[in-house]
Swiss-Prot record:
This protein's record includes keyword Thylakoid: no
Entry binding sites for Zn(2+) 1: H8, H10, E74, D193
Pfam families: PHP (PF02811)
HAMAP family, sorted: YcdX_phosphat
Metal-binding recorded as keyword: yes
Entry note: cofactor: Binds 3 Zn(2+) ions per subunit.
GO annotation, biological process: bacterial-type flagellum-dependent swarming motility
E.C. numbers: 3.1.3.-
Name assigned to this protein: Probable phosphatase Shew_1420
InterPro entries according to UniProt: Phosphatase_YcdX_put, PHP_dom, PHP_phosphatase, Pol/His_phosphatase_N, Pol/histidinol_Pase-like
Family, as annotated: Belongs to the PHP family.
Sample GO molecular function, one term: phosphatase activity
Cofactor entry: Zn(2+)
């Protein structure tokens, strides 16, 4: 099983990451990756890029040397209301919006608080994908979140980095999330959460998990460029036709 689309990658604009857009393009070419998203951390993170970084992503070509580049963000969920740190008409200019919990912005609290924050964030309509929802530092009502996400056409991420260097102890939660999303009829997406270009498209542990739960591949959004682009179009994102040559 091979996935040639990655929705979650950070550049040196997030200064705890170590690669440029050019670095990612080189690795994508080497690995045969067809489409990937640049999703630097939202501006409320201490070392995140300025708000204008995201506004100016319009200068990025959507296709470079046959590789699609999505203009995105991994926004920070700020509070129980589900607010994120990027807003207004600027959201509509991005191709893909991830959002998740990060300790410097939203300190871990109770399961009830975390669950309500995710539900409100999903229901806001501002977010396409919830990033690393299996983080054990932020326990949630998995069944409820999966059902709300399915109802509102929002995907939950199985984050490969959570099984390697970050968010230790995520496997049990992520397995439960995959089972709950399968039951609810919703979507998953696999993300490398790459902070260095070498790990772009690295999904080995996430693939093991989805195989274990027998998750239907047609409901894993990055199983093909077409599937992800059709999902983003259904979410109201414009410009997806510009990627026609890679579909």
């Amino acid at each position: 099983m091979k996935f040639l689309v990655d929705v979650h990658a950070h550049t040196i604009a997030s200064t705890h990451a170590y690669s440029t857009v050019h670095d990612y393009l080189a690795v994508a070419k080497e690995k045969g990756i067809k489409l990937f998203a640049i999703t630097d951390h939202g501006p409320d993170m201490a070392d995140a890029p300025h708000f204008w970084h995201f506004v100016n992503m319009r200068v990025l070509p959507r296709i470079v040397d046959g590789i699609g580049v999505l203009r995105g963000i991994e926004a920070n969920i700020k509070n129980e209301n589900g607010d994120i740190d990027f807003f207004g008409s600027y959201l509509n200019e991005l191709d893909i919006v991830l959002a998740g919990f990060h300790e410097p912005v939203f300190q871990p609290s109770t399961q009830t608080t975390h669950t309500q924050a995710l539900v409100n964030c999903i229901e806001s309509g501002n977010v396409d994908i919830i990033s690393h929802p299996g983080n054990p530092a932020y326990p949630i009502d998995i069944k409820r979140v999966a059902e709300v996400a399915a109802t509102h056409n929002v995907a939950l991420e199985i984050n490969n980095s959570s099984f390697l260097t970050s968010r230790k102890g995520s496997l049990k939660n992520c397995t439960a999330i995959a089972r709950a999303v399968k039951e609810a009829g919703g979507y998953l997406v696999l993300g490398s959460d790459s902070h260095v270009a070498f790990s772009l498209g690295g999904f080995d542990k996430a693939i093991e998990l989805i195989q274990e739960v027998d998750f239907p591949i047609e409901r894993i959004l990055n199983h093909s460029p077409k599937a992800l682009l059709e999902f983003l179009t259904s979410r109201g994102h414009k410009g997806m036709d510009e990627y026609a040559e890679i579909v």
